[in-house]
Amino acid sequence: MNLEIRRDSINWHVKINDLKEIMSSLQREGNYWEGQVFLTKRKKEYNLSFRIFLNSNDEDEFDVTDGQLILSISDDTFSLLEEYTVMVSEYGTPFAHELNNLYFISLKKWLGCHIYVEND
């Protein structure tokens, strides 16, 4: 997996099996999945909320057939992710970060993120 930061979006490349594991750990809320980003700092654990929205063409499912789905994150979360790599945890936590500093994050405006699904 790798994370590519653009001016107004994040491109996240992930293997399809890892994506399935992430999606199965998320909680369905209306027309989006909601979960937590787990942050670790000197043996302390923090978390941030995030949402994966469904495909706008069909609110009953998200689209991975063309190799991507849309993830939306807040402005502050976007700024935080610019400096750190996102990795899938093997033990149930969707994302893990090693942080030098922890910033207060308030969920405000949402930015777009494309997740490109790699078949292998």
Cite the ranges covered by each PLM segment.
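Positively charged, low-complexity terminal tracts
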Residues: 1-120
